[in-house]
């Protein structure tokens, strides 16, 4: 449900078309993450992080480690709760647009998609 809402929102706001659920690696080939949406043109990751899958003790540790890998690689990340996507899509749209502009204002991080797009 949340990913369907995210896809609908991304089409509606007309940013570059994101790639969905692709694996991102750094220049050494080390896996950084698998964002729900990846805006390859600017190196922006969008994660739809539900409490059910990210806030158990081990899940939370993995989420923090993932976010640290994104930061170390220079990737800007937008994190959205599914409930916020459902209840406040306009606010989420504004955040995505601003984040896309912010990412575009900097050199694209030296990362690549390691799965076919």
Model-derived segments and their meaning:
Residues 1-117:
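Surface segments flanking catalytic/ligand-binding clefts of nucleic-acid enzymes
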């Amino acid at each position: 449900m949340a990913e369907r809402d995210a896809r609908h929102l991304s089409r509606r706001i007309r940013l570059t078309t994101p790639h969905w659920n692709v694996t991102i690696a750094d220049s050494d080939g080390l896996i950084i993450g698998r964002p729900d949406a990846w805006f390859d043109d600017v190196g922006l990751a969008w994660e739809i992080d539900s409490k059910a899958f990210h806030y158990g003790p081990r899940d939370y540790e993995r989420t923090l480690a993932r976010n640290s890998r994104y930061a170390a690689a220079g990737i800007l990340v937008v994190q959205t709760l599914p409930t916020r996507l459902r209840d406040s899509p306009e606010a989420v749209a504004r955040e995505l647009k601003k984040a896309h502009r912010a990412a575009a204002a900097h050199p694209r991080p030296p990362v690549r998609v390691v799965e076919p797009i």
